[in-house]
Amino acid sequence: MAIFCNNVLAALPTQCNPGFLDDLPPRIRKVCVALSRIYELGSEMESYIGDKENHITGFHESIPLLDSGVKRQDVDHVFLRFGRRR
């Protein structure tokens, strides 16, 4: 979805240029303002996600992996069966 949004938002309509906004009908002006807000929000989300990815990558690199060479014996999860009894 991010690729689709980037392609759409990167090419705002020429009618939404600040020089043309005064000449536009109010409804079209509202659409242009909404598109501008969506573009700003999208770029802020991309920068936030980029910051999070950098933080997570650094966090994972700082944790050493434990490799004892022994298969784990503990129970990590429980399988539950739902439905009718046979």
Curated annotation (Swiss-Prot):
Keywords: Amidation, Cleavage on pair of basic residues, Neuropeptide, Pyrrolidone carboxylic acid, Secreted, Signal. Residues 1-18 form the signal peptide. Residues 19-70 form a propeptide. The keyword NADP does not apply. Its main location: secreted. GO terms for cellular component: extracellular region. The modification Pyrrolidone carboxylic acid is found at residue 73. One of its GO terms (biological process) is neuropeptide signaling pathway. The keyword Cytoplasm does not apply. It comes from the Eukaryota. It is found in: Secreted. The modification Phenylalanine amide is found at residue 82. Belongs to the myosuppressin family. Myoinhibiting neuropeptide. This is Myosuppressin. It comes from Apis mellifera. The lineage of its organism: Eukaryota, Metazoa, Ecdysozoa, Arthropoda, Hexapoda.
